[in-house]
Amino acid sequence: MAIERTLSIVKPDAVEKNIIGKVISRFEKAGLKIVAAKMMHLTEEKARGFYAEHEGRPFFAGLVEFMTSGPVVVQVLEGENAIALNRELMGATNPAEAAEGTLRKDFADSVGRNAVYGSDSPASAEREINYFFDASEICPR
């Protein structure tokens, strides 16, 4: 099994609901370690840069507006097959289609307000982690 790192974001809707601890607890119970974390309010520029691959799509402006609407918690998770495990814990993008017991089924309101984000591949994880964190901010444990 491969030890991987993945980026996770607790989105503004979940922060507003005060469920950060519940989200983190699920990661830790599943065996993932948090090796970096910070709470921040994304600027429009930072959100646009992070979601640049979606620029030009109909949902882009709404996504940027939502992600800048309140604070987020950005973290790096580490563990065996962390990318796939995090995606399994999150559940389907649409909470109505998410499996019981997943973060999105339990905490998300809609496709647009779906509580959490996670990297979808090793290449994305590396790029996204580097977008938010300097190497000195990551604390292997």
Curated annotation (Swiss-Prot):
ATP binds at K11, F59, R87, T93, R104, N114. Its EC number is 2.7.4.6. Pfam families: NDK. Keywords: ATP-binding, Cytoplasm, Kinase, Magnesium, Metal-binding, Nucleotide metabolism, Nucleotide-binding, Phosphoprotein, Transferase. It catalyses: a 2'-deoxyribonucleoside 5'-diphosphate + ATP = a 2'-deoxyribonucleoside 5'-triphosphate + ADP; a ribonucleoside 5'-diphosphate + ATP = a ribonucleoside 5'-triphosphate + ADP. GO terms for biological process: CTP biosynthetic process; GTP biosynthetic process; UTP biosynthetic process. Its cofactor is Mg(2+). One of its GO terms (cellular component) is cytoplasm. InterPro entries: NDK-like_dom, NDK-like_dom_sf, Nucleoside_diP_kinase. It is found in: Cytoplasm. It comes from the Bacteria. GO terms for molecular function: ATP binding; metal ion binding; nucleoside diphosphate kinase activity. Major role in the synthesis of nucleoside triphosphates other than ATP. The ATP gamma phosphate is transferred to the NDP beta phosphate via a ping-pong mechanism, using a phosphorylated active-site intermediate. Belongs to the NDK family. HAMAP family: NDP_kinase. Homotetramer. This is Nucleoside diphosphate kinase. It comes from Saccharophagus degradans (strain 2-40 / ATCC 43961 / DSM 17024). The gene is ndk.
